[in-house]
Regions:
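Multi-pass membrane catalytic core of lipid/isoprenoid biosynthesis enzymes
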Residues: 8-13, 54-111
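Short, amphipathic, aromatic/basic-enriched membrane-interface segments that mark the entry/exit
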Residues: 1-10, 64-72, 127-133, 182
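Transmembrane alpha-helical segments that form the membrane-embedded catalytic/substrate-channel core
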Residues: 45, 104-117, 167-181
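C-terminal membrane-associated helical module and adjoining short loops/tails
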Residues: 122-182
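Topogenic membrane-insertion module of multi-pass membrane proteins
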Residues: 1-49, 172-182
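Lipid-exposed faces of alpha-helical membrane segments in multi-pass integral membrane proteins
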Residues: 11-17, 37-40, 76-79, 98-105, ...
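Cytosolic, membrane-interface loops and tails of multi-pass inner-membrane proteins
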Residues: 47-63, 113-130
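Helix-coil boundary and interhelical linker segments in multi-pass alpha-helical membrane proteins
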Residues: 21-36, 76, 80-101, 146-162
Length: 182
């Protein structure tokens, strides 16, 4: 079998499975429950790197595989899945579709940029990163569920505000600023 198999990728794959389940829930009209899957995927992503770094004697190939598999799973979990969720919530007009495609594209650009910069950084140092460059794509796993809790307060404005929220998040993925890691 190709790939690298150890406990270091379990949380990454668990987050991916949660996103897959969330997409199925969304397709079947259960977007509210799918939001829990999105949040759970974010929780898994928060700790997968910490778990991976606990393995002693990781090879360079294992490290590079970890960076790539994490970002590929992030495209699904925090790019495609939220796009599908927002589409199911009503972002279906021309403006909504353009915003969703922009959001996904910005997320992919952000992840590809991260991969290049992280591999370079790891070649130069073993120190942990202290800052994010741009808004991490995982942030949607907090932003979207919290935003959806405002639905009763926003009433008929919810959909227009959702458009603004997703557009803003997509822009923050690719705007160059530093955000201190927690």
């Amino acid at each position: 079998m190709i790939g690298f198999y150890s406990y270091t990728v379990i949380l990454t794959y668990l987050g991916l499975a949660s996103a897959a389940l969330g997409m199925m829930l969304t397709f079947n009209g259960f977007a509210r429950y799918a939001l829990f899957c999105l949040a759970f995927s974010g929780l898994c992503d928060m700790f997968d790197g910490k778990v991976a770094r606990t393995k002693a004697n990781r090879t360079e190939d294992e490290k590079r595989f970890g960076i790539q598999i994490d970002s590929l799973c992030d495209v699904v979990c925090f790019g495609a899945f939220p796009m599908i969720l927002c589409y199911s919530m009503g972002m279906r007009g021309i403006a909504g579709i353009c915003i969703l495609v922009f959001y996904l594209t910005a997320g992919v650009i952000r992840l590809a940029f991260f991969n290049v910069m992280e591999e370079r950084r790891q070649d130069e140092t073993d120190e942990a990163r202290k800052y994010y460059q741009g808004l991490p794509i995982t942030s949607i796993s907090i932003i979207l569920p919290l935003f959806c809790t405002l639905r009763p307060l926003l009433g008929h404005r919810f959909l227009s505000e959702l458009h603004i929220c997703i557009l803003t998040v997509g822009l923050l993925f690719i705007i160059n600023f530093q955000l201190k890691k927690p």
